[in-house]
Amino acid sequence: MSHIEQEERKRFFNDDLDTSETSLNFKSENKESFLFANSHNDDDDDVVVSVSDTTEGEGDRSIVPVRREIEEEGQNQFITELLRIIPEMPKDLVMELNEKFGSQEEGLSLALSHYFDHNSGTSISKIPSSPNQLNTLSDTSNSTLSPSSFHPKRRRIYGFRNQTRLEDKVTWKRFIGALQVTGMATRPTVRPLKYGSQMKLKRSSEEISATKVYDSRGRKKASMASLVRIFDIQYDREIGRVSEDIAQILYPLLSSHEISFEVTLIFCDNKRLSIGDSFILQLDCFLTSLIFEERNDGESLMKRRRTEGGNKREKDNGNFGRTLTETDEELESRSKRLALLKLFDKLRLKPILDEQKALEKHKIELNSDPEIIDLDNDEICSNQVTEVHNNLRDTQHEEETMNLNQLKTFYKAAQSSESLKSLPETEPSRDVFKLELRNYQKQGLTWMLRREQEFAKAASDGEASETGANMINPLWKQFKWPNDMSWAAQNLQQDHVNVEDGIFFYANLHSGEFSLAKPILKTMIKGGILSDEMGLGKTVAAYSLVLSCPHDSDVVDKKLFDIENTAVSDNLPSTWQDNKKPYASKTTLIVVPMSLLTQWSNEFTKANNSPDMYHEVYYGGNVSSLKTLLTKTKTPPTVVLTTYGIVQNEWTKHSKGRMTDEDVNISSGLFSVNFYRIIIDEGHNIRNRTTVTSKAVMALQGKCKWVLTGTPIINRLDDLYSLVKFLELDPWRQINYWKTFVSTPFESKNYKQAFDVVNAILEPVLLRRTKQMKDKDGKPLVELPPKEVVIKRLPFSKSQDLLYKFLLDKAEVSVKSGIARGDLLKKYSTILVHILRLRQVCCHPGLIGSQDENDEDLSKNNKLVTEQTVELDSLMRVVSERFDNSFSKEELDAMIQRLKVKYPDNKSFQSLECSICTTEPMDLDKALFTECGHSFCEKCLFEYIEFQNSKNLGLKCPNCRNQIDACRLLALVQTNSNSKNLEFKPYSPASKSSKITALLKELQLLQDSSAGEQVVIFSQFSTYLDILEKELTHTFSKDVAKIYKFDGRLSLKERTSVLADFAVKDYSRQKILLLSLKAGGVGLNLTCASHAYMMDPWWSPSMEDQAIDRLHRIGQTNSVKVMRFIIQDSIEEKMLRIQEKKRTIGEAMDTDEDERRKRRIEEIQMLFE
C-alpha cells in the first residue's frame, strides 16, 4: 500500500492531522459513507478517483433568469421541451440548438445527442463491483460503527440539501437502519451530481387501483419499479428509478408518513448521468411518531368490514362456502405489511430475545470509548461481515419463515394437553349451581374463568394469576433502537428530532402495529372456543361459567353504562356509529339454533340454584324493549336466549336502513346494547362469512365471546376463519393475514404449514376433549355405555332394481362422455342430479321426481330436476305395469269372483286366520290373498317368500301347496274413505322398498323383545320421512307404536311439543321419532332413546357421527345400538368407501370451491367404477 493511501486513511480517522490540500483522494468504494464499511477488497483492486471541491456558489446556480429571458423573447415548442429536459442549459446554447435542429423531424433527439457529445468531457466508466448488492447497516448488526468513530479532518462541501423538516402531524422520527440502493437514470443530467446531494422518493402520481398491482392472493402482478421515482430535490425533477426489489418495499410505504426515508447520493462516478446509467444512493430509514400512535381500531375495523361486506369482487362459488377474497383496502393493507417485513429483513433488525442481556450490552456501549475502525483492515471488516451473515438467519421476518417455532413453543407450553390434565378443578358454588359437574368439566370451568381473567373465581394452583402477567404477546417482537448512522448524522452532525430516551420499541410486523410500551399478554381477547366432542356436556359447561360469573365484576356496582365501550359494528348503517350503546354488564346473550331453544331453556332451569338469577327467551316478540329490560331494571336477566334467525332478522332490518336516526336511538333489540358475554352454540353455523347469518352474528357486541361447536371444520379449513373473526383474535381476524398463513399455503397443497399455523392460532383459545381421552389418573373422562354400529346390507326389490339399472345406465353414459371429452366439471350439476336419483331409488321409488330442500347436492332452483320429471313418470308407469298387472283382465276378474264366493260380505272377514302365525282375526289392512284363496299376514307371507327365495325353493302355498306368485296377490281396500265396504284389488309390491321392509321387520323384532323402547330414525330426505310415517302408521296400530316426525317444517312450539312428548317413557308401546338429519343432527339431547336407524348415508361422515351422538352422550344409561341400512352393489356402498377415505385424510382438505369440485369429481369417478 502506498504512503499516500496510508496517509489518507489516517487523515480520515484523526482530527489532529491537518492539511491544506484542496482535494481528497478516496477509494471508489466511497468509504465516506459507512455503508461501504464491509468492503474488504485487496489494495491492488482499488481504483483511486479524484474528486475536486466544488467552486463556491456553483451549487446554487439558478436557471430561472435564463428561462424568463427566453420567455420574454418568445419561444417555440422545441425550446420548451429542451429546457424541460435540461433546465440548466445556457441561453446562447439553447438558441444555437434551436436554429440547428428545431425544424427537423427528430430535432429534439438530435439536439440532445449533440449537446451530450460536445459538452461533457467526462468519460463513462463502470460503477464499482457488485453495485446491486444491498449492503446494510444498523446497530443490531454492527454496533461498533457509531458516528463518533468517524473524524473527518475538515468540513466538505456537499451537494444541495434542504433543511430537514418533519412531515405534517409527525412529532419525531428515529433511525432504524440504512440501505445502499442502486438507481438507474431515466433522464440525463448536464453535470455530475454532487456527493451528498439530497434526493427524494415519490410514488407515481397516477392513481392505480390495488387490483391492478396485486392479484386476488396478494401477489404482485405489475412491476413496481415504474411506480417509484427518484427526484432531485433541488429542481424537483425526476432523475431515475430504483430496482424492483427495493420498489416493492418502498411503493406501499410511501403512501403514508409512518415510515420516513432520507435519500442521499453517495456515488455517480463523478460524471454526468445519461439515460440508463447507474448511481448509488444511501437510503436512511426512520420510524415516525405516527406509527406509534394509538389507532382507532374500532373505526378502522368498521371501515374494513364495510368495504368487505359490500365488495362486489367477492363471488359465491357454491353452497359449501366461498373462497376468501380480499378487498382493495385489504390488499393495500397486506402489501404494506409485507413491505414492512421485507424492510426489516433488509435492515437485518434482530428481535431481542433476552432483554437483560441487551440492557447490559447497552450500558457497556454507553460507558466505553468510541472505537476507531480501520475500513482498510481486511481482518476487521471480514469479521464484521461474518458476524452479519451468521446473524442473518435470525432476522428473517417474512411469512415463509415467520419465526413460528417461537410462537408454537409458547402456545404449547401454555396450553399443552398435559397442562390441561393438570388444571385444578373449580367447583361452582351450590348457592348458584345445582348440578354436579364431572372432573373434566370442573377443569374446563377453571380454563374458561382464566380465559376471562377471572382468576379470583377460578381454582388456583399458584400459577394462574401470574400466567402472562408480564409476558410479551407472542405475536409481537422487541427491538432495540439502533444508533443513528444516517448520512446526515454522520456527515453533517445533524440531530434528528429526539424522542424520549427509550431503548426498545415493539412491533407486530405481521399486522403492521408498533408500540413504545410492552404489549403484554393480558391485552388478548377474553373468551374462546369450547370444542368438546358431541355428548360431553358443552351446554352444562357454559352454564357453569355463566352462573359462576354472572356479571362483569369490573363494572357492576360502579356504573351502569360503559361509556368507553361504544364501538358499533361497521356492518350496521353509518347512522349507528356515533351512538353510544349502554352496557348490559349483568347479562349473557346465548344464540342457538331454533331446534335447541327449548332445550337450552330447560337446561338453565335445571342448573340454576339462585332465586336472584333468571333467564329470558327472546323470541317471537315476547319482549317489548330489550334495552330497557337489560339496562334500566334492577334485576335484568342473567341469560337472554335467542336464535340465529332472530339475530339475522334484526340485523337485516337495521342494515338495510329501514330505521331512522330516532328509531335507532330508541331501538330495543339485540343491537341496542353491548353485552357482557356472548355465547353462540353450534358455532359452525357462521362458518361462511358472506352469509347474512354470519354477518349478523359478527355485528353483536360483547366483552367476552365464546363459541361452542363439536365440529369447528365442516368442509374447508377456512371454516375456522369466521370463528377467529367473531372472537376478534388479532391479527388473525384480518383476512389478509389469514390468507397469507392459512389459505394460501393450503391452496398450494402445503397442508402441514397451514395446519401448524392453525394449531398455533387456536391452541391458546380452544379447549377440546373427546370421549376417548383419559384424565391424569388414566381413567376415561366420561364413562359412557357401549355403542354398536351395525351395517345391514340389503338387496334391491325387483321394482327398485329395474329403476336403478335404468338410471345407472343414463348416469354412466353422462359420466363417461364427460371424461372422454374432458369436460366432466362442466357436467357437474347434471351428474349430481343423476347421483341424487340413484340415491333416491335406494331409499324408495316414491322419492323419484321429488326435490328435497334438505339435499346438499341441489339448489332449490335446479332446473335439471324438473326436466327429468316427465321421463321418470313414464318409467314409473312401466314399472307399475310390469309388477302390478301380472294378471290379465280376465284372470283378475275370475280370481275376484272366486274370492267373493268364499267371502261374500264384510262379516266373513272377521274370522280370517293367518295360516303361518295363526293370528285371529287378522288386521284386514295387512291381509293378502293367494290365487288359491288362502289368506296370510303381509309380513308373514313375505318372510316366507324371502326364505324360499334364499333357499332357491319354489313358492308354494303354505296351506294347499299350490304354486303361488308374489306378483299375483290381492289385498283388501276400502271402496272410499267414508265407506266400510271392502273390495279386492291387486297388491302392488312396487310400493315397498327393501329398506322399509327391513325397517318394519327390525322394529317388530324390537317390539317383541322389548316393548316400550324409544327409537330414532334418521334420514336426510324430508320426503322420505313422509313415506316412512305413512308406512309405519299403516303397519303399527296406535296401541303398539306412536309415531313422531321432527323436521324443518315444524314451528318452535311444535318442535318443543314433539321432543317433550317423545322423552316421556311409555312401557306399553314403542315410540318412534322420525328425524331429519339436517334439522336434528346436532344439538338435540336424545338420551331417552337407545336405538337408532340410519336410512341413508351422508356425504360427510362427521354429520352422521353428530347424529349418533345425540343418543350416545352424557346422560345415556343404556347401550346404544345403531343400524345403518345400505343397499348392496349400489352407489351407497361406494359412498361408504368415500366416507372412510374422508375419515382417513380429514374433511378439511377442500381448499376452495373449485378444489372441492375437483375432489367431488374424483369421488364421482369412484362411484361409477
From Swiss-Prot:
Binding site residues for ATP: 532-539
A GO term, aspect molecular function: ATP binding
UniProt-listed Enzyme Commission number(s): 3.6.4.-
Domain Helicase ATP-binding: 519-730
Biased segments, Basic and acidic residues type: 302-317
Result after altering residue 914 to S: Abolishes interaction with UBC13
Region of interest: Disordered: 302-327
Cofactors required: Mg(2+); Mn(2+); Ca(2+)
Family: Belongs to the SNF2/RAD54 helicase family.
Its job: Probable helicase, member of the UBC2/RAD6 epistasis group. Functions with the DNA repair protein RAD18 in error-free postreplication DNA repair. Involved in the maintenance of wild-type rates of instability of simple repetitive sequences such as poly(GT) repeats. Seems to be involved in maintaining a balance which acts in favor of error-prone non-homologous joining during DNA double-strand breaks repairs. Recruits the UBC13-MMS2 dimer to chromatin for DNA repair.
Listed name of the protein: DNA repair protein RAD5
Species per Swiss-Prot/TrEMBL record: Saccharomyces cerevisiae (strain ATCC 204508 / S288c) (Baker's yeast)
Taxonomy of the source species: Eukaryota, Fungi, Dikarya, Ascomycota, Saccharomycotina
